Design a protein with these regions (language model features):
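Conserved N-terminal segment of class I S-adenosyl-L-methionine
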Residues: 1-92, 98-100, 114-117, 162-163, ...
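Hydrophobic adenine-recognition pocket in adenosine-nucleotide-binding enzymes
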Residues: 104
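S-adenosyl-L-methionine-dependent methyltransferase catalytic module, highlighting the catalytic core
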Residues: 7, 11-18, 22-23, 98-101, ...
């Protein structure tokens, strides 16, 4: 969710960061139904270089991050917002077809995440989808070790607030109004990362 170096993938340095960003983007793209791409997407916590939005096809693209864009992405409608302080999304109800939160949840405390998911539910169109990726809780210690030796960004890992599990994400989805029969989960990157989708 934090800002990134110009032309980079994540804030700070890490040998594996470009690979991990590409993996998240690839996973998210595979989880988006083709029929939704004719509408609007919002990427929450996209970073100041919006790698995923630059590598996905949608009619209209919107971005939220806590710092301004570091590069000129003319096709992206940019909004600067710190979601830990202000969880309300500045959009009308049923505005988006897809909302993505890639490597964002771990930067939010549970109360902020629940509030944000409520806003996501409000702004999704009926039939729309939210997609989340976040490190598995069991990967937390490994990620901190990888940050110490320069494989992943120490700045990003240092800002991880909470380590989530798939059952907990599912409970949060249900709490804000998503039907559990429309929630799906899985792992990738050898079980160290998780994805979750919920359809409104």
């Amino acid at each position: 969710m934090a800002a990134e170096r110009k032309g980079g993938f994540t804030r700070g340095k890490g040998l594996l960061e470009p690979y991990l960003a590409r993996q998240r983007a690839s996973r998210a793209n595979r989880l988006i139904p083709a029929e939704l791409r004719a509408g609007c997407i919002l990427d929450i916590g996209c970073g100041s270089y919006p790698y995923f939005l630059a590598h996905t096809a949608f009619k209209d693209k919107f971005a939220i991050d806590q710092l301004p864009a570091a590069v000129d992405e003319g096709e992206i409608h940019w909004h600067t917002l710190n979601l830990n302080k202000e969880p309300s999304l500045p959009f009308d109800e049923a505005f988006f077809d897809v909302v993505t939160m890639l490597a964002v949840a771990e930067h939010l405390n549970p109360a902020s995440l629940v509030n944000l998911l409520g806003e996501v539910h409000r702004t999704l169109m009926p039939g729309g989808r939210v997609i989340i990726t976040t490190p598995a809780a069991r990967a937390d210690g490994l990620l901190r070790w990888m940050a110490r030796i320069g494989l992943v960004s120490a700045e990003e890992i240092g800002e991880h607030t909470f380590a989530y599990t798939l059952p907990l994400l599912g409970w949060y989805f249900g709490r804000v109004g998503f039907g559990m029969e429309r929630v799906h989960f899985g792992y990738f990157e050898l079980g160290l990362n998780m994805w979750a989708t919920a359809d409104r």
